């Protein structure tokens, strides 16, 4: 795997510095305890119908059962994203933009056998994920870098596929898709799963604004994704509305001891129609 890029821990802006600081300090049990279930640490939400029996029965085991069920739904979400990456072969190279602690990157390598580059602003996340790669014996194929996803330094047309899993709300979409378009080989695939506010609703609702403040992010309008893709040679080939599929996850998480307090805000945002959870896949032309 090429190691020639320069890793720079200096954020490109004050805002990026605040994001790096946030994730360097983050040690939320809803991320860590779920990852300890099977060693795949995710930083995204889940989809699918839960097994509601986990919140019933023996209170002594309910916490563990609920944790496992939340993790199952988050892993299912990652699998659904990977299903849309297209024809990735072992000789290809792909990138996880906003990789967190690396869960989806390891899943991608196991599925495709290819090289995976993970990118995060957080030194803590990168160090954690690289330690995981060494423990798994795949450090020669899966590597994590403290880099700005808007300016990675990777070679032009070096990637077969790139994905953002709930990380686009931290960047300008035109800048992001310009860099992704540069990195993707012609015919390569880009996939994102993201929350976005519904243009039909108007401006961001109070619930969406609360989510922005909670995560120090800037949720984009749905239309913004398609405008920025069109401007950067990314042609959508699939759009899947996952809003209804993610609401049960949030209802289960709200009942969990791992709830962080933001759950009811997400439920309100989704059920009011002001917020949507989408998968968008696009081809580089």
UniProtKB/Swiss-Prot annotation:
Per its UniProt record, what Pfam families does this chain match?
A: Methyltransf_25
Q: Which reaction does it catalyse?
A: (2E)-geranyl diphosphate + S-adenosyl-L-methionine = (E)-2-methylgeranyl diphosphate + S-adenosyl-L-homocysteine + H(+)
Query: What top-level branch of life does the organism fall under?
Result: Bacteria
Q: Show the GO MF annotations.
A: C-methyltransferase activity; magnesium ion binding; S-adenosyl-L-methionine binding; S-adenosylmethionine-dependent methyltransferase activity
- Keywords, comma-separated and alphabetical: Magnesium, Methyltransferase, S-adenosyl-L-methionine, Transferase
Annotated EC: 2.1.1.255
The broad enzyme category this protein falls into is: transferase
> Which biological processes are named by the entry's GO terms?
methylation; terpene metabolic process
Cofactor(s) required for function per UniProt: Mg(2+)
Q: Which PANTHER family match?
A: GERANYL DIPHOSPHATE 2-C-METHYLTRANSFERASE, ZGC:194242
Q: What is the stated purpose of this protein?
A: Catalyzes the SAM-dependent methylation of geranyl diphosphate (GPP) to yield (E)-2-methylgeranyl diphosphate (2-MeGPP).
Mind telling me which NCBIfam families this protein's record contains?
Answer: GPPMT_Stmyces (NF041943)
What is the similarity comment for this entry?
Belongs to the geranyl diphosphate 2-C-methyltransferase family.
Question: What is this protein identified as?
Answer: Geranyl diphosphate 2-C-methyltransferase
Q: Which organism is it from?
A: Saccharopolyspora erythraea (strain ATCC 11635 / DSM 40517 / JCM 4748 / NBRC 13426 / NCIMB 8594 / NRRL 2338)
Question: Taxonomic lineage per UniProt?
Answer: Bacteria, Bacillati, Actinomycetota, Actinomycetes, Pseudonocardiales
């Amino acid at each position: 795997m090429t190691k020639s890029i320069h890793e720079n821990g200096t954020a490109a802006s004050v805002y990026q510095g605040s994001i790096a600081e946030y994730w360097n300090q983050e040690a939320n049990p809803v991320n860590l305890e779920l990852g300890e279930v099977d060693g795949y640490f995710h930083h995204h939400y889940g989809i699918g119908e839960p097994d509601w029996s986990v919140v019933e029965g023996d209170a002594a085991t309910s916490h563990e059962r609920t944790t496992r069920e939340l993790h199952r739904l988050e892993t299912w979400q990652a699998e659904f994203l990977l299903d849309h990456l297209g024809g990735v072969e072992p000789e290809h190279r792909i990138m996880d933009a906003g990789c967190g602690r690396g869960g989806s990157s390891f899943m991608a390598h196991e599925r495709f056998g290819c090289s995976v580059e993970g990118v995060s602003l957080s030194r803590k996340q990168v160090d954690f994920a690289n330690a995981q790669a060494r423990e798994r014996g795949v450090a020669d194929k899966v590597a994590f870098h403290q880099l700005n996803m808007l300016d990675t330094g990777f070679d032009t047309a070096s990637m077969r596929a790139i994905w953002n899993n709930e990380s686009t709300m931290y960047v300008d979409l035109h800048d992001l898709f310009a860099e992704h378009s540069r990195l993707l080989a012609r015919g390569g695939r880009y996939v994102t799963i993201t929350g976005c506010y519904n243009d039909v609703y108007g401006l961001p609702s109070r619930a969406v604004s609360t989510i922005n403040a909670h995560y120090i992010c800037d949720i984009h309008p749905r239309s913004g994704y398609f405008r920025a893709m069109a401007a950067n040679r990314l042609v959508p080939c699939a759009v899947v509305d996952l809003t209804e599929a993610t609401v049960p996850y949030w209802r289960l998480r709200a009942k969990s001891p791992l709830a962080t307090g933001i759950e009811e805000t997400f439920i309100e945002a989704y059920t009011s129609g002001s917020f949507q959870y989408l998968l968008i896949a696009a081809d580089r032309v």
